[in-house]
Amino acid sequence: MRRRDFLARTAGGLAAVAMVRAGEPRRDTAPDAGIPGAGDKRRRIAISTWSLHQYFSATRGKSSALPGEMLELLDFPAMIADRYKIHHLEFVAPHFGSVEPSYLKDLKERLTKAHSHLVNIPVDIPELHKGGGLSDPDDTVRAAGIAGAKKWIDIGAELGTRAVRCDPGRMKPENLAPTIDSYKQLAAYGKAKGVDVIIENHGGVGSERPEELVKLFQGVGQDFKGALPDFANFPDEPTRERGLKLLFPYARVVCHAKGLEFDAQGNETRFNFPKCMEISKQAGFQGIYSIEFEGPGDPYLGVQKTLDELLRHL
């Protein structure tokens, strides 16, 4: 199930956020025995709220029968730190309970208390999927998408995130000019705020023809390292291997270490997970591997299985 399926539920639910200067998490908090020490592989791992999206009201499927209590984003940092000893996080935009300044202040304090850091916000908002989104040839449509994305760059800056992920919408390989223009604007805006704007192979052209994303990166600028490679978002193994080899040289913040299904030995069965890790290492990737579990069954267990496999190959 894709995040964009839930965009309609988010429309009208978020207010504009006041612009506040970004701050680093406090360094004066007492040391915590659960924080990974130097050399611990967990320091290279994050967990996305999307892994547990069935426990967030905004993205729970109507037919979901998974047992357990629903989650609130404010409680996510402490829960993940306690349960998995992971202190890097991704917050998907629909999972925010609010974007009012008081809520963001509380959320930032919860991150600090858990000794955790926000790595990325996947910006799944209706404005980025109206018409052609950031790739629409109509300047008015694109302007709305750009404005919506900028609001989330502001939110990310306030929370101290390293990046926000903004989908390009309906990219047209025969005319990348509108898409390039949108990301030039967003990259410049993000740079001024200390936030990278990144792009995922998240279906459509980006997944089926990843070389078009490379053309987009090159069009935005030689120093634009805007890739968010997702291990699973490809139609087949040859495209996956080719796509990851193309995208990882342009990735510096985060990639998605996807978990789908596992055998009795705990190995991912739907795609070649070790090969994905090998490609990332060969490319010299030094960023964060963020877990996105999207398989059947208990998602808490799925996150653990994905974490275990990631630790084996990292």
Could you describe each region identified by the protein language model?
Residues S290-E294:
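Short acidic/histidine-rich active-site segments
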Residues T59, H88-L89, P173, A177-I279:
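Acidic/histidine-rich catalytic cores of soluble enzymes
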Residues L89, V164, C255, I288-Y289:
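Hydrophobic residues within beta-strands of alpha/beta enzymes
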Residues R2-E158, E174, K191, Q222, ...:
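N-terminal pre-domain/capping segments
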